[in-house]
Amino acid sequence: MTTIVSVRRNGQVVIGGDGQATLGNTVMKGNVRKVRRLYHDRVIAGFAGGTADAFTLFELFERKLELHQGHLVKAAVELAKDWRTDRMLRRLEALLAVADENASLIITGNGDVVQPENDLIAIGSGGPYAQAAARALLENTELGARDIVEKSLGIAGDICIYTNQFHTIEELASKA
């Protein structure tokens, strides 16, 4: 598993993730890049779940973004529809956290597209820890989005055995 966290604050949207890949109880790799830029660097996305499944979903999502000229919500809904109805895709086990300048979304393997409250996303095994940390920092500090993501990932990595301290963080300017 993993931890992916996204925060939108003060004109910035940031998604960060750890780099640990496990096979059962064994750490296989510690520097996986689970956060990427898509669609001409106008969308950022992170994944939690099986690595091969997630890379497949990244490719499919990028195709949907191209098809819908970068419209994040439309591309997410269309990917979720395909994910729900296609027999091969239904077997993929991953969650995507995606964001552009206007919206932050979670796309699930059940075909759900969720726009979270307060534009805070935290998914994966360390998600609850990162979410609690990010929420506390959002409510009680003036830290920027990147700092909140960094600190939340650090806290999750200290608590969750499936999350490490190797972080990939991407950010975009935000209108929302």
Swiss-Prot record:
Looking up SUPFAM superfamilies in the UniProt record yields:
N-terminal nucleophile aminohydrolases (Ntn hydrolases)
Q: Which Pfam families match?
A: Proteasome
One GO CC term of this entry? HslUV protease complex
Q: Which GO terms describe its biological process?
A: proteolysis involved in protein catabolic process
- Catalytic reactions of this protein: ATP-dependent cleavage of peptide bonds with broad specificity
Compartments it resides in? Cytoplasm
User: What does the record give as the active site?
Assistant: 2
Top-level taxon = Bacteria
Q: Which InterPro entries match?
A: ATP-dep_Prtase_HsIV_su (IPR022281), Ntn_hydrolases_N (IPR029055), Proteasome_sua/b (IPR001353), Proteasome_suB-type (IPR023333)
A single GO molecular-function term is: threonine-type endopeptidase activity
Under which EC number(s) is this enzyme classified?
3.4.25.2
- Which residues are listed for Na(+) binding in this entry? 157, 160, 163
* Keywords associated with the record: Allosteric enzyme, Cytoplasm, Hydrolase, Metal-binding, Protease, Sodium, Threonine protease
Activity regulation description: Allosterically activated by HslU binding.
How this chain assembles, per its entry, is: A double ring-shaped homohexamer of HslV is capped on each side by a ring-shaped HslU homohexamer. The assembly of the HslU/HslV complex is dependent on binding of ATP.
What is the protein's known function? Protease subunit of a proteasome-like degradation complex believed to be a general protein degrading machinery.
What does the sequence similarity comment in the record state about its family?
Answer: Belongs to the peptidase T1B family. HslV subfamily.
Q: What is this protein called?
A: ATP-dependent protease subunit HslV
